[in-house]
A protein has these predicted regions:
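Positively charged n-region of N-terminal signal peptides that target proteins for export
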Residues: 1-8
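C-terminal motif of bacterial Sec signal peptides marking the signal peptidase cleavage site
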Residues: 19-23
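Hydrophobic/proline-rich hinge and linker segments of small-molecule sensing/allosteric domains
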Residues: 49-53, 106-113, 184-194
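Short glycine-rich His-centered loop
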Residues: 86-89, 104-128
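Extended ligand-binding regions for polar small-molecule ligands
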Residues: 40-87, 131-140
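Bacterial signal peptide processing site
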Residues: 25-27
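Acidic, polar ligand-binding/catalytic clefts
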Residues: 32-43, 135, 139, 144-194
Length: 194
């Protein structure tokens, strides 16, 4: 009885496979001709930087720099987003400080350096869109850039609760929940999932 059942299952499997392969045959008008790609945005997000609630001076300063340096910021984005893997491997700076020592003269950034091309380690160098924009902002403010790496989930709460962090930069999506804890700068990047 087991041999008969096994033989019947084998025959059923072969027949099913034959129909499946026939359905996929492009010449035979199979299922592949019925598939249509539709270019529809499923979700869109904006990335922005964050500052502590109530720090309107820093928020306005950063927003002003984002406006004034829009051309340079776009060039930074183009550099990274159009780069090959080999080119990405050449970017970055090993002269960026990674721990704060003089808060008044430093722009201290809380980030997670694990999201290329926005933030990433290139050997012992720190690179990425956010890092270069942070350097631009620090230069405009006349401050030394300090970048502190932490878990992604800690970036928002660190800016919210720890005074040494001036700004959070980690390809942060603008969301209502985060906006309850921190202030978002103007968006600097739009992304869409299709």
């Amino acid at each position: 009885m087991k041999k008969i059942l096994a033989a019947l299952l084998t025959v059923a499997t072969v027949i099913t496979c034959a129909f499946a392969f026939t359905a996929c045959d492009k010449k035979g008008g199979g299922a592949t001709e019925k598939i249509k790609m539709v270019d529809v945005d499923l979700s869109s997000e904006q990335y922005a930087f964050i500052v502590k609630k109530g720090d309107t001076k820093l928020l306005n300063t950063v927003n002003g720099i984002l406006d004034a340096k829009a051309t340079e910021i776009q060039a930074i984005m183009d550099k990274y987003l159009n780069a090959t893997e080999d080119q990405l491997a050449t970017f970055g700076s090993n002269s960026i400080k990674t721990s704060a020592t003089d808060g008044a003269n430093e722009l201290v950034v809380a980030t997670n350096i694990d999201f290329a091309p926005f933030e990433y380690y290139n050997g012992n160098k720190i690179a990425g869109i956010d890092i270069e924009i942070a350097q631009l902002i620090a230069n405009e403010m006349g401050k030394t850039l300090v970048v502190e790496h932490m878990d992604f989930d800690a970036v928002v709460t660190s800016v919210q609760n720890i005074d040494k962090y001036d700004i959070g930069m980690a390809a942060l999506t603008i969301s209502a929940d985060r906006a309850k804890m921190v202030n978002f700068t103007k968006p600097y990047f739009d992304t869409t999932q299709v």
